[in-house]
């Protein structure tokens, strides 16, 4: 699986010349607002050209894929780059079908999550970055208002120095709430992906950028 870290991880390998530095952070809490220390936060996203490691041969293995265990306050932090949106290839079967239906095959910039903790329901989700032309027009119908997150550009020298960065960066904050459950089968990812996940995977695979 993806490399694991406690509290903080760098996700990208630094090789993307067009990558804008992203500081991704948040807190995992229960429905009562209490932090969940040690929560397992699995994160993955594509590069600045819309490609995912494993499916893009130009990238290193596990590039922009990490598992971060939340710290004592339930917080996780990752340094990476802002992902790009992507679409199905022009003329591919899916593109032909979508156009026949009057639809496009574009997806906005987004970041995938699995979040889990003992005694809590496993969560599969993603966030769409605000400001992308397709944020509210995702062909996979994956946009939810509460999952649209801004990428705030930070230019304050003190904030840059605190993170030991070389220049301005985009900060993305996404807090997660997990519901409590005693049911063991709800504490792990379902073996069979939901139909919408299947559709997203198929579109990504056709684009050469599968998100698995």
Language model features: what each stretch is:
Residues 1-212:
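Beta-strand-dominated extracellular/periplasmic modules and repeats
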